[in-house]
Amino acid sequence: MKFFQLLLSLFILIACANPKAFKPVSQYPPDPWVKGYANPNDCIGGETLAASKFVLPIYPRRAFKSGRQGWVLVKLNVDEYGETKDIIIERSLPGGLFDVPVNKAINQWKFDPPQNGEMKNCRVLIRFRAGEVSLGR
């Protein structure tokens, strides 16, 4: 009887000691060519557009746990007070997975008031890769 209790305890310990390992998906979709979406007079994040208050989006928990990666290309305007407005997700891969955290983050961004009154059609690429969030060009 003790042998079976010991054997059962051993199987329980082995089962508990082997949680499913996190394995990120290595297939990251190629970044879009941001300038290809823009007109010659549009601003591009990291070039003519630089925030004075900036927070990166939070990597969604379910995307992180499932190893999902991707990017979001955002078009936005900056008003005369340096606040973001008219935020549009132009494209995202995988579609819709990262859109909500991107919108939440961009709504918090602040810029120095533009000298021309406002900046229109600014584009920003946000990458979600291997649990990290970064800006692209």
Q: What is each of the regions a protein language model found here?
A:
Residues 16-33:
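Bacterial Sec signal peptide processing site at the extreme N-terminus
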Residues 1-9:
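Sec-dependent signal peptide recognition
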Residues 61, 91-97:
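A short acidic/small-residue loop/turn micro-motif
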Residues 32-75, 100-137:
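Short proline/glycine- and basic residue-enriched helix-capping loop/turn segments at helix->loop/beta transitions
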